[in-house]
Amino acid sequence: MPSLRPTLLAVAVLSAGLAACQPQTAPAPTETKATAAAPASDPAVDARLSEISQQWLDGWFRLNPVSATQIGKHDYDAQVDDLSAAGRQAQVDFAKKTLAALDGIDTSKLSRENQIDAAILRNQVQGDIWSVETLQSWAWDPQVYSGLAGGAIYNLMAREFAPMPERLKSATARMQKIPGIYAQMRENLDPARVPKIHAETVAKQNAGILSLIDTFITPNADQLQGEERKQLDDAVANLRKAVAEQQTWLDKTLVPNAKGDFRIGQKLYDEKLQFSLNSSLSRAEIKQRAEGELKRVRAEMYAIAQTVLKDKPNAPEMPADPTPEQQQKAIEAALELAYAEKPARDQVVDFAKQTLAQATDFTRKHDLVTVPNDPVKIILMPEFQRGVAVAYCDSPGPLDKGLDTYYAISPIPDEWTPEQADSFLREYNSRMIHLLSIHEAMPGHYLEGAHSVKSHSTLRSVLRSGLFAEGWAVYTEDMMADAGYLDNDPLFRLVQLKFYLRTIANAILDQGVHVDNWTKEQAMELMTKQAFQQEREASGKWTRAQLTSAQLPTYFVGAQEHFDMRKAVEAKLGDKFNAKAYHDQVLSYGAPPVRYVREMMLDEPIK
C-alpha cells in the first residue's frame, strides 16, 4: 500500500511506497531469450530518451520537493510544493513540454527496456496534466494539503539519510513554509465542491502534524545552537499557531460549508483508472472478473468449512450443493474457529514481529525467491497517517541507499471500547496477522522493493507501479499458502482466501461507490456478508472508498495480471519452469506495470 500517502500531482504510480534496498545478484533467466531476433535499437534514440528522462526527473523533483525527499533526492529538502495557480500552471507547462519531447521520438527504434520507460513516462506526464486540468483535486480535496504538510516533516525526519542537525535545518525551513500551504488550501478549495467526509477527515487529522513535531523535532532540538536553534523554536511556535488557526477555519468554515459529492462519476473514474493502473483491463472487465472470483473463492471456502467443521458439535448443515444461506453459515462457522485465536489488544505489534520472522524463515527454507538481507523494522503508524489503512510497508526511496524499510502498523486506539477492540481483533486474528506480514513484508512489499532497486533506470525506480507492487503482494499470499505455510493449516488457507476476498471486494466496492452510486448499506452488505469482514474493518473501508478513488482496485487487478503471467510462462516453459528463477526474474525489471513485465518474459512486442 502505499500504498498509500497523498501527494498532489503524482498519480497512483508513486503511492505504493517508493522502494530501494541493496542490489541483489541478477537472477538466472527462466527462458531462452528470443529478443536477439528483434530489430536492433538505435543508440542515438536511446540516448535521447535517457536525456528526456533525466530532464523530467530533474524538473519533477524541483516541482515536487516533498515527494523528492521521500524518493531520496535531497536537493530540495528545504522547499515545499507550490499549489498556487502559478505553481499548478508550472506543473502543467513542464508536463506538456516533456510530452512534446516524447512525441519527437520514434519508439520503435528504442531498446525494449527503453520502450517500457518511454511508455511509463508518457502515462505519468499525461496523468499529471489530467490531474491538474481535469480531476482538479487541488480545488476539492483537502487531503492534498494535509498530506503535503505532514509529509514535508515526516519525509525529512523518519529516516537518517543525513545527520540530524542538517535535517533539523531543512525542517525549520519547511515549518516556516507550511503556513503557506494552509493559506493555499484556504485560497484554492471551493467548499461547494469539497465532500463533507473529506472536510471532516482533514479536520480530525489537522493536529496530527503537531505529534510529528513532538516526536521528531522537539526531542532533538538541542542539536542546534545559537541562531539556528532560535529559528527552529520560532518556526515551531509559528506552526503551532498556524495549525490552531487552520483548525478554526476547518471547523467553522470548511466543514459546515462542504457540499461536494465524494463520488467522482464514471467519466473521471474511467480516466483515473487508466492513469493510475496502466492496466490492459477495463472497468467492465475488472467487475466481471471480480464477481466471478467472488463466487469461486466462496465455493473453495465452503469446501474447507466442510472439512474443518466435520464432526464438530452444533456444526451447520453442509450439503454438497448448498443454498446461499447454507454456504454463508458454514463459512462463518469455520471462520469462527480462526477468530478465536487472536493476540491481546496491546500485543498486536509484538505478534506481528514474530510472524515476520516466521514468514522470512519459511521463504528462505522453501527457496521460493531470493531473500535480501536488508533490515525490516516494525513501527507504530504515525498519527497523521492513521484513519485510512491499517498497515503499510514504508520503504526508503530508490535514491536513498541502505536505509531501513518500515512495516507500519496502526495500534488499537486507547479510546476504543472492549467491544470495538474485539471486533478489530477478530478481523486481525493471529492467522490474519501472519497474512499481513506476508503481504506487507515477506515475501510481499518489502522483498519486492528490495529486488526492484536493481532496476535498470532511475526513472523505472521512481515511477514504480503500484499495480505491480500490490499485485505481487497479493500473489505472494497465495504462493505461501500453496507452499504449505503454517503446516498446511486449513484454517490458514481459509483466512488467506478471506483476505483475498477483501481484495476482490475492494475492486467491486470502488466502482460501486464512484460509478454505480452505491449506498453505505450496499457497501456493507458486500463486505460484511459476501466477504465476511468485521463491522469495524468494513466501516473503515467504506470511509476509504469515499476518500479515495481508483486505488482500491490496484490489489485485485495487479494480482490477476500476476496470476495470468505465471500461467502464461508456465505454459511456455513446461517442465523447465522453476518457481524461484521465475520470481527472481519477475522482480528484476524494477516494478513497471505488470503488462510490460509479461511482454518482456514472453518476448512479446512492448505496447
Write out the residue ranges for each language-model feature.
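N-terminal maturation segment of proteins
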Residues: Q22-K607
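C-terminal motif of bacterial Sec signal peptides marking the signal peptidase cleavage site
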Residues: G17-A20
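Bacterial N-terminal signal peptides that target proteins for export
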Residues: M1-L9
